[in-house]
């Protein structure tokens, strides 16, 4: 249902969404839809005038925007913007309010910095981006406190969400009587997948959204790997860019649908330990796909843990033994797994759709420092 946000008697709110996008499908396919293009869906569903500009085209942002005026700029996201050689200085005078999203943790533990030295470098690059924004929305609840203190800017917590249209109503019987993990295999995940206790009940599933045709089309898009020459000032951006964006949307939506359908192949979706200290996109994707989700319980993040009730809407674990027990519960009692999955879908539909999250961001920006409650 479409709602109208903005002035009650005035025009709709106008937001420029600056979206991080990679040039190659090999890297770009790992960008979760629910953390990128979904925000465009959520803005439009709320009656907000939205123009999205992706990073391959940010050098032409003035040509693309033309004479348009904006109330806000949303930068999605600073975690990935720091991977590109791009300055956000261009966006400072595009709108008085500039909201920077952070979809990865900014701060990490000492042992994580030692295992992944690039995290320190990324933090330094992210820190440089904060001077260009007026508001910060972070996925890690501890970062919310730290960033607000360090940069003295309004900061809100931003848990993952899912566009309502991608929440499945009917789900078929799983093809495999196993729990599945889909995603990057790094760090401790390698050992988890080799655990003897888990070998017969947990399988790794390769991403289903890596088809050669889609990868080739993505890489050939204007401004991308093989189409960079079309992002040239000799070509009129206001003609080329809308066509580019339409093709990109189609590829992103198709890949997202294939990803969700792939999650339905197993009896449960497993979220293995990860670096970000908030539920990864895999959790909300698994819940939306209609399968019970068994997730690593993130230490020292009570708000995150409270998003979904353990044993009723999600199943949590901290050790390989606990993970094996939770998987066995689902495999031995399919009705129990279906109840967990249905309860979770109900929760997502009521409180964690992207449409709802967009409303929360807009209202928070309008009433800075107003706390958001996601625990219902």
List the model feature ranges, each with a label:
Residues 2-62, 77-87, 105, 111-284, ...:
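Nucleotide-sugar donor-binding catalytic core of glycosyltransferases
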Residues 310-311:
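Glycine-centered loop/turn motifs
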